[in-house]
Amino acid sequence: MGLPLTFDDNNQCLLLLDSDIFTSIEAKDDIWLLNGMIIPLSPVCGDSIWRQIMVINGELAANNEGTLAYIDAAETLLFIHAITDLTNIYHIISQLESFVNKQEALKNILQEYAKV
């Protein structure tokens, strides 16, 4: 990604990529927890987007690529994934790049469903 990572006092690093891809990294004792904002989402939006979210969540789980989670207080859909192997910097960079690419793809797909 070519970006320096700076963590705050809460062990979090916030990244804004391409002006609309927001990702946070939370460094815990033995994992990095990645959170990527996908779309703002009202709990009363149509059924088709919730069905699509469940389909995508199943695919993510089957491929061990993370999960989608709805944050009620913020009315936001997040993409969440944990990096569990912190021993290899190249693996970490690869996982971060894969996460951001998947986040962008999910955002593009689900934005279309949110418009319907």
UniProtKB/Swiss-Prot annotation:
GO terms for cellular component: cytoplasm. It is found in: Cytoplasm. One of its GO terms (biological process) is protein secretion by the type III secretion system. Keywords: Chaperone, Cytoplasm, Virulence. The keyword Chaperone applies. InterPro entries: SicP. Molecular chaperone required for SptP stabilization and secretion. Belongs to the SicP family. This is Chaperone protein SicP. It comes from Salmonella paratyphi A (strain ATCC 9150 / SARB42). The gene is sicP.
